[in-house]
UniProtKB/Swiss-Prot annotation:
Expressing tissues: In the eye, it is highly expressed within the lens, particularly in the anterior lens epithelium and in a ring corresponding to the equatorial region where anterior cells are differentiating into lens fibers. Also highly expressed in the retina.
Molecular function, one GO term: GTPase activator activity
UniProt record similarity statement: Belongs to the Rab3-GAP catalytic subunit family.
Organism domain of life: Eukaryota
Keywords recorded for this protein, A-Z: Cytoplasm, Endoplasmic reticulum, Golgi apparatus, GTPase activation, Phosphoprotein
Function: Catalytic subunit of the Rab3 GTPase-activating (Rab3GAP) complex composed of RAB3GAP1 and RAB3GAP2, which has GTPase-activating protein (GAP) activity towards various Rab3 subfamily members (RAB3A, RAB3B, RAB3C and RAB3D), RAB5A and RAB43, and guanine nucleotide exchange factor (GEF) activity towards RAB18. As part of the Rab3GAP complex, acts as a GAP for Rab3 proteins by converting active RAB3-GTP to the inactive form RAB3-GDP. Rab3 proteins are involved in regulated exocytosis of neurotransmitters and hormones.
Modified residues (Phosphoserine): 83, 379, 536, 579, 581, 590, 664
Entry protein name: Rab3 GTPase-activating protein catalytic subunit
GO cellular component: cis-Golgi network; cytoplasm; endoplasmic reticulum tubular network; postsynapse; protein-containing complex
Quaternary data: The Rab3 GTPase-activating complex is a heterodimer composed of Rab3gap1 and Rab3gap2. The Rab3 GTPase-activating complex interacts with DMXL2. Interacts with LMAN1.
Pfam families: Rab3-GAP_cat_C (PF19533), Rab3-GTPase_cat (PF13890)
Length: 981
């Protein structure tokens, strides 16, 4: 019984072979990726066109897999092509070898100038690469390499994928790949050798042919012919007789008068070093066979001059120093500084002298002014010394800018200062009529900068140049200090600021430009007021405010009236001017109180008989047709105050105040009153000019659409016109009615000023004085970028480079978006400057190449045009073919460049090296050689032979070799028949 029970007690161990190992899971993941990308089964594309590897579109897609805890990235690289016709495709797929094997023999795209390294080495249009995901990871051991190769071989066999699959091994900088491609009964193995030092027997064609033949091991005799493609690359680094001519501008020479002060308005341009560092000449023999050429360790038939194909590429200098880019970059750096002008210069910029006088004046101002201005006031009375005296005081020996430079800049900014007295109105330019040749004149609208002939624009250029060449930040602070003092001097002495458009501030420009325009408006108003006082005191007939009604009546007619009505339709430009101001505009006349009394008593009724007895004042001219409804007197257009000009910050401030009033009835009423200051002023002027008038009379002139006339028949049967106010004018508590009832008959010259030029000018001057250099740079940076873009466009027009035109359009579009924001980000500004520098470098490269190839020295127009096209292609394309190779016009020039460089190198050789070079004949040969030893030797060997057996299918074999000073690489693709071996 015991014996019988023993077998039953035994436990059998069962091995489950369905449990996948890490290796099997890895293979499964590779297959899964290939399936997802639909790389299963045969694929056949169109024959490769010449140059398609460079001109075509390459795309890639990636995924990530892992082998245990080691991560790999899988990337599919492929050339985008149209799929062939379905019928043709089905015919060709029968018994066809994989597409990649056919590509090994294609000669249309040997040595592509820009392509993936595997494309260059093997001529493939599609392939998959498995590489370690982390940059630092590497597959180093031979066993791991073999494991990965086994994995991809199994995955290709299981899926039927005919796309080559590569594995990257060793460190990534070595670019070492092993791979495989499988087809029906065929297989191609991709192998590679990478050495730092090349064995001497493999430096020439004969040695490489030996390797190729031994590798394919063809048993046939004679061996099928081997097709050979050879490329030798020569590098030219020494540009003899073509020194880079660009020199930084000499500011001292400019100030000394050699060039002239106007050079301060021009930005520099160009590279400080040659932006072309090397020229690479590739001499190619695309179709050779083994028997027609000799290249061994003793003799070579490979003469570059006799090569049938030449191509050239240029190597650009890395980040060449460019003047324009440096100028703008340095100016941008000021925006990041935090020091004030006083801190930089180490003294108070606007310190006052004569404290006793200042204190007395301040005391008087307290007595005469009802409310102080809520800013530190630099009033005219406090300016005991003129701005010019202050300039002399502040300009000491320690000043960052010497007097010659400063005077040259100030004369450039203020050309009217050449005469003893600045010109009057002629100093202000009219930007509304740009020069017809200035097609880019309106570019400032897009950049929110300033017109290119304006003072603000010139100031930006001068500050940019001073920052770069004269004192940096201190020089900028010094010039700004002098500029602000000049502004005050002009305000005090009624001298208009040159280089600014007349009229209200242009909100399309930068805020600083608007502030200067506002100051100019103040000077104009002050000047007109002062002249008006003089003429009224002398009883001149050319008074600015004529009181005699009959002198100008009916002169301008109905057209002028319509313009005036349109102008008067705008209501309430300044809330600030409505409030009780400490500044009074009216003159202290003896009958003012009587006038007020009459006005208050009669204002409520609108136009009573008592008002008709008042003397008319402030008439501009008689209206062409209209008469007063009440008494039939002619209607006179009054002299009115102009609305207050405003800058964008004042408009924003006004909007905030109006918004804070809320939506209540009281707030809305107060808002309406604040906005009706201009309307109230015009009503008072109208009442003063037309005693006995009614609201209807005012509306007929001021807003004709609100007075409705219709034809009616009177009692006698006559058709007459009868008019009445519009519906909106009849609304109870109408703002117009309220304003009319409160308006008094006061002419414009006696009214409180809508625009207090004294206060506004002081606010502007205070604003300018408080600007730090960083604030100033922020204001002016749009002008500097604007100037840089104009400079780039000007320089490009001389060269006519298509790619540069495209980049300039991108710069303008980008800048327009960025600069319209109040405080653009530094990163976005740096991007714009980088684009400008890129364009500058491209133009500098074009000029460098034109100088080297001597385009201006060509005697024949055809040769010149051909060279210019050649230079343009060198800038646009990675590699350019030389028409006629060494025998063409461009080829002869390139040959001459190499000859000159060789001769210069031979002269520079020391005697010891000449002695070492051997016999005199060898020395002579070395010196006479037109070209240096090739910097790179590339060979492609191809053959179609049966492998591994004589009866195997004839399949493509290929080996690529590259030899440089640094390394030696062999990349072989060897196909074999897996059915008949």
């Amino acid at each position: 019984m015991a014996a019988d029970s023993e077998p039953e007690s035994e436990v059998f161990e069962i091995t489950d072979f369905t449990t996948a190992s890490e290796w099997e899971r890895f293979i499964s993941k590779v297959e899964e990726v290939l399936n997802d990308w639909k790389l299963i089964g045969p694929s056949l594309g169109k024959p490769l066109e010449k140059g398609i590897f460079t001109s075509g579109t390459w795309e890639e897609r990636s995924d990530e897999i892992s082998f245990a805890d080691f991560r790999f990235s899988v990337t599919h690289h492929y050339l985008v092509q149209e799929s062939p016709d379905k019928e043709r495709k089905d015919e060709e797929l029968e018994d066809a070898i994989p597409q990649s094997m056919q590509d090994l023999l294609c000669m249309n795209n040997d040595f592509p100038p820009r392509a993936h390294c595997l494309v260059r080495w093997y001529g493939l249009r599609e392939f998959v690469v498995i590489a370690p995901a982390a940059h630092s990871d590497a597959v180093l051991s031979e066993s791991k390499c073999n494991l990965l190769l086994s994995s991809i071989s199994i995955a290709l066999g299981n899926t039927g994928c005919q796309v080559p699959l590569f594995v990257q091994i060793h460190h990534k900088w070595r670019r070492m790949y092993m791979g495989e491609c499988q087809g029906p009964g065929v297989r191609t193995d991709f192998e590679m050798v990478h050495l730092r030092k090349v064995p001497s027997q493999y430096t020439h064609l004969s040695g490489l042919l030996d390797i190729f033949k031994s590798k394919i091991g063809c048993p046939l005799t004679p061996l099928p012919p081997v097709s050979i493609a050879i490329r030798l690359t020569y590098v030219l680094q020494d540009w003899q007789q073509y020194f880079w001519p660009q020199q930084p501008p000499d500011i001292d020479a400019l100030v000394g008068g050699e060039v002239g002060g106007l050079e301060f308005g021009k930005l520099p341009f160009g590279a400080c070093e040659d932006p072309i560092s090397e020229l690479h000449l590739a001499t190619t023999w695309p179709h050779l066979t083994e028997g027609i050429i000799v290249d061994n360790d003793v003799y070579s038939d490979l003469d570059p001059v006799q090569a049938p194909h030449w191509s050239v590429r240029v190597r650009k200098a890395d980040n060449p120093q460019c003047l324009l880019g440096d100028f703008v970059t340095e100016f941008l750096k000021i925006c990041r500084r935090k020091e004030s002008t006083d801190e930089i210069l180490g003294r108070s910029t606007f310190e006052e002298e004569g404290r006793e006088v200042a204190d007395i004046t301040h005391a008087l101002s307290k007595l005469t002014e009802p409310a102080p201005v809520p800013i530190h006031k630099l009033s005219v009375s406090n300016m005991v010394h003129t701005a010019k005296k202050k300039i002399r005081k502040h300009r000491g020996e320690e000043s960052p800018l010497n007097s010659d430079v400063l005077n040259t800049i100030l004369l450039f900014l203020f050309p009217d200062a050449v005469s003893e007295k600045p010109l009057d109105g002629t100093t202000s330019i009219d930007n509304s009529i740009p020069a017809p040749e200035a097609g880019d004149y309106t570019l400032y609208n897009q950049f929110k900068s300033a017109p290119s002939d304006s003072l603000t624009y010139k100031l930006a250029l001068c500050l940019c140049m001073i920052n770069f060449y004269h004192g940096g930040l201190k020089g900028v602070a010094h010039l700004w200090q002098e500029f602000v003092l000049e502004m005050r001097f002009r305000w005090e002495n009624n001298f208009l600021i040159p280089g600014l458009a007349s009229g209200s501030p242009d909100l399309r420009c930068c805020l600083l430009h608007q502030k200067l325009q506002m100051l100019n408006c103040c000077i104009e108003r002050k000047k007109a007021r002062d002249e008006g006082k003089k003429t009224s005191l002398s009883d001149s007939t050319t008074s600015a405010y004529p009181g005699d009604a009959g002198k100008t009546g009916g002169q301008l007619g109905l057209d002028h009236l319509r313009d005036t009505e349109k102008e008067k339709g705008e209501v309430g430009k300044s809330w600030d001017s409505w409030s009780d101001s400490e500044e009074e505009f009216f003159e202290c006349l003896s009958d003012t109180e009587d006038l007020k009394g009459n006005g208050q008593e009669s204002g409520k009724k609108g136009g009573p008989k008592e008002m008709a007895n008042l003397k008319p004042e402030g008439r501009l001219h008689q209206h062409g047709k209209l008469t007063l409804l009440h008494n039939g007197e002619p209607l006179y257009i009054p002299v009115t105050q102009e609305p207050a000009p405003m800058t964008e910050d004042l408009l924003e401030e006004q909007s905030e105040v109006l918004a804070k009033l809320g939506t209540s009835a009281e707030g809305a009423h107060l808002r309406a009153r604040m906005q009706s200051a201009c309307l109230l002023s015009d009503m008072e002027s109208f009442k003063a000019a037309n005693p006995g008038c009614f609201l209807e009379d005012f509306v007929r002139w001021y807003s004709p659409r609100d007075y409705i006339e219709e034809e009616v028949t009177d009692e006698k049967g006559n058709v007459v016109l009868k008019g009445e106010l519009s519906a909106r004018m009849k609304i109870p508590s109408n703002m117009w009615v309220e304003a009319w009832e409160t308006a008094k008959p006061v002419p414009a010259r006696r009214q409180r000023r809508l625009f207090d030029d004294t206060r506004e000018a002081e606010k502007v001057l205070h604003y300018l004085a408080m600007q730090k250099p960083a604030d100033l740079a922020r204001h002016l940076l749009p002008c500097v970028i604007h100037a840089a873009v104009l400079k780039v466009k000007e320089e490009e027009s001389l060269e006519n480079i298509p790619s540069v035109k495209k980049i300039i359009k991108q710069i303008i579009a980008h800048s327009s978006k960025v600069l319209h924001f109040p405080n653009p980000e530094d990163k976005k500004l740096e991007e714009i400057i980088l684009q400008i520098t890129t364009v500058e470098a491209i133009i500098a490269r074009a000029r460098s190449l034109k100088a080297k190839f001597g385009t201006e020295k060509c005697e024949h127009e055809e040769e010149k045009e051909g060279l210019e096209r050649f230079v343009s292609c060198l800038l646009e394309q990675p590699e350019v073919s030389v028409t006629g190779a060494g025998r063409g016009h461009a080829g002869r020039i390139i040959h001459k460049l190499f000859v000159n460089a060789q001769r210069a190198a031979a002269v520079a050789l020391p005697e010891e090296e000449l002695k070492k070079s051997g016999c005199p004949e060898e020395r002579r040969q070395t010196l006479v050689s037109d070209f240096p030893p090739p910097a790179g030797r590339e060979l492609i060997l191809r053959a179609t032979v049966p492998r591994p057996a004589p009866y195997s299918k004839a399949l493509p074999q290929r080996m690529y070799s590259v030899l440089t000073k640094e390394d030696f690489r062999l990349a072989g693709a060897f196909s074999s028949d897996t059915s008949f071996f």
